[in-house]
């Protein structure tokens, strides 16, 4: 589904905005600090319930206001859906879908699958395993209907188990948690492994187009010994876990490793090449979703020209257009995106939180 209309109130430096959007490319042009990234962040927040630049709600709500309000209209082939999110300074949220309250943020995420490409997005490649787990979990969330509930239950059980490790003296006292934890861990790991295998060819093909000078490999590590039963791992590791006061092995320690010519990509690629790789991975993931489910992503790209030369920008623009997805791009200068515009695209000028088309 594409976002045809966006209303923003008291979000970052934007007091009020009402934007009619293109189902294709939408460009946000303005100087640094003008508010163009805030528009991207508002869209992201509408689909995720949280901002991507700050987890502190006070920094997202406009100065001296009590709450932000976001509203969007989504248009699909067969239906139109209205979505809304309000969040106050206490962090209390109201999610509204088609006029009714009481919905969950996960429902917004299902309606609005997004791929975010920002200058800070290098964390996907060099920021540690949790960011690469999140990459896999995004795919599992949108491809496996039971994933979100299982993942939420896993987080809850791990938190309870870790708390219990501070109190118990014998493994038998932990067994009730592990009886629930083990099947969830194995199911989530199987979903991640299946997804990483299914998308491998898409990633390899897209990366070969963006970075033909490198041989890239991808491997999923589930977070405990490959041939070991997870129940045995937990029981054998009880004394170590009790000393650490947390569970040392499991799906919460999984990783998705990416290597270039046999070495970690963060040690091999330049910043420009890392951005290309990040773009390739996000594109491959979005295209895989479309092929498997018929749904298209919204692509949010902040500071489009950063780290990319003209040829690389042209390649990325070409691939994005081929997806027939809705794309939002911020840039400091219109010159950087002129070759991406067409009769169906829209360009917005952003200046001190004011947005005009």
Curated annotation (Swiss-Prot):
Signal sequence extent: none
Pfam families documented for this protein: SMC_N (PF02463)
Any one Gene Ontology cellular component term annotated for this protein: cytoplasm
Primary residence: cytoplasm
InterPro entries: DNA-binding_RecF, DNA-binding_RecF_CS, P-loop_NTPase, RecF/RecN/SMC_N, RecF_2
Function: The RecF protein is involved in DNA metabolism; it is required for DNA replication and normal SOS inducibility. RecF binds preferentially to single-stranded, linear DNA. It also seems to bind ATP.
Family: Belongs to the RecF family.
Listed name of the protein: DNA replication and repair protein RecF
Source organism per UniProt: Cronobacter sakazakii (strain ATCC BAA-894) (Enterobacter sakazakii)
Gene (name only): recF
């Amino acid at each position: 589904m594409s976002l045809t209309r966006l209303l923003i109130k008291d979000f970052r430096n934007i007091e009020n905005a009402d934007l009619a959007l293109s189902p294709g490319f939408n460009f946000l042009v303005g100087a640094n600090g003008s508010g163009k990234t805030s528009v991207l962040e508002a869209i992201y927040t509408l689909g995720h319930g949280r901002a991507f630049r700050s987890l502190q709600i006070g920094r997202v709500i406009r100065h001296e206001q009590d709450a932000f309000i976001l509203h969007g209209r989504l248009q699909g082939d067969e239906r139109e859906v209205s979505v809304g999110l309000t969040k106050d300074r206490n962090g209390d949220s109201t999610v509204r879908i088609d006029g009714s309250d009481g919905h969950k943020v996960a429902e917004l995420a299902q309606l609005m699958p997004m791929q975010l490409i920002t200058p800070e997005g290098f964390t996907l490649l060099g920021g540690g395993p949790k960011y690469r787990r999140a990459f896999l979990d995004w795919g599992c969330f949108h491809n496996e209907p039971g994933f979100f509930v299982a993942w939420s239950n896993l987080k809850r059980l791990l938190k309870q188990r870790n708390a219990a490790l501070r109190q118990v003296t014998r493994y038998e006292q932990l067994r009730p948690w592990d009886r629930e934890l083990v099947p969830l861990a194995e199911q989530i790991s199987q979903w991640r492994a299946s997804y990483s295998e299914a998308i491998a060819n898409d990633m390899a093909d897209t990366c070969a187009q963006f970075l033909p000078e490198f041989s890239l490999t991808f491997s999923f590590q589930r977070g405990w010994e490959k041939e070991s039963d997870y129940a045995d791992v937990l029981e054998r590791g009880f004394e170590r876990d009790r000393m650490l006061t947390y569970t040392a092995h499991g799906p919460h320690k999984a990783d998705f490793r990416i290597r270039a010519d046999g070495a970690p990509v963060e040690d091999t690629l330049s910043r420009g090449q890392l951005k290309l790789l990040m773009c390739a991975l996000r594109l491959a993931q979005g295209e895989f979703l479309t092929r498997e489910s018929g749904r298209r992503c919204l692509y949010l790209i902040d500071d489009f020209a950063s780290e990319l030369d003209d040829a690389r920008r042209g390649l990325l623009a070409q691939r994005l257009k081929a997806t027939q997805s809705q794309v939002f791009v911020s840039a400091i200068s219109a010159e950087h995106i002129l070759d991406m515009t067409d009769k169906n695209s829209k360009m917005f000028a952003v200046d001190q939180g004011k947005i005009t088309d």
